[in-house]
């Protein structure tokens, strides 16, 4: 049995959870999230707690058991507090500018790259080198941050590019000069 899946989820005050079979809707101060869960798990409300239980004991059911509990917990945290991911731009002349709800990246290409956020995601720029992706759906926030990072991944020789805040980029040594045959 999954140790994560066995833990009950506390529903905080101000959060409304509607369970209709395997369809769950969570409403909170930040918004509303809905998700359909796999038939391998059942979701029940017991007082102030949500309990996820597996239907069988096969390998696939055990895998979806812990996953379903974590997805449900992320829905509750998202509508209560929201999620955000911070990105940093490293490199001379590389910058990001806000243009309405879009962000324009100038990261060393001959052209600038404009990124428009999908519904439910907000992009903000702090200074010219810090970008914050925020929203209530953890999957969407992470996906948007990954797409922005993929515009110009950090270079392993100089470290230039777009990286997650706090991400360590291992710098490779350059070519050794003066070695070999003369």
From Swiss-Prot:
Cellular component aspect of the GO annotation: cytosolic large ribosomal subunit
Pfam family, one: Ribosomal_L6
GO aspect biological process, one term: cytoplasmic translation
Record keywords, A-Z: Ribonucleoprotein, Ribosomal protein, RNA-binding, rRNA-binding
Family as reported in the entry's similarity comment: Belongs to the universal ribosomal protein uL6 family.
Role summary: This protein binds to the 23S rRNA, and is important in its secondary structure. It is located near the subunit interface in the base of the L7/L12 stalk, and near the tRNA binding site of the peptidyltransferase center.
Quaternary structure and partners: Part of the 50S ribosomal subunit.
Name the UniProt record assigns to this protein: Large ribosomal subunit protein uL6
Source organism of this protein record: Dehalococcoides mccartyi (strain ATCC BAA-2100 / JCM 16839 / KCTC 5957 / BAV1)
Encoding gene per record: rplF
């Amino acid at each position: 049995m999954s140790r994560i899946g066995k833990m009950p989820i506390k529903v905080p005050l101000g959060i409304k959870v509607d369970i209709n079979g395997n369809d769950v809707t969570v409403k909170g101060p930040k918004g509303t999230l809905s998700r359909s869960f796999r038939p391998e798990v059942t979701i029940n409300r017991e007082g102030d707690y949500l309990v996820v239980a597996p239907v069988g004991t096969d390998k696939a059911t055990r895998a979806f058991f812990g996953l379903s509990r974590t997805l449900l917990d992320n829905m509750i945290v998202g509508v209560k507090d929201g999620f955000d991911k911070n990105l940093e731009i490293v490199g001379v002349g590389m910058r990001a500018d806000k243009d309405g709800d879009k962000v324009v990246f100038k990261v060393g290409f001959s052209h600038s790259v404009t990124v428009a956020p999908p519904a439910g995601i907000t992009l903000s720029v702090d200074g010219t080198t810090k970008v914050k992706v925020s929203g209530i759906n953890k999957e969407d926030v992470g996906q948007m941050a990954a797409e922005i990072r993929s515009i110009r991944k950090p270079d392993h020789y100089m470290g230039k590019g777009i990286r997650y805040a706090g991400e360590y980029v291992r710098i490779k040594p350059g070519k050794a000069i003066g070695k070999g045959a003369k």
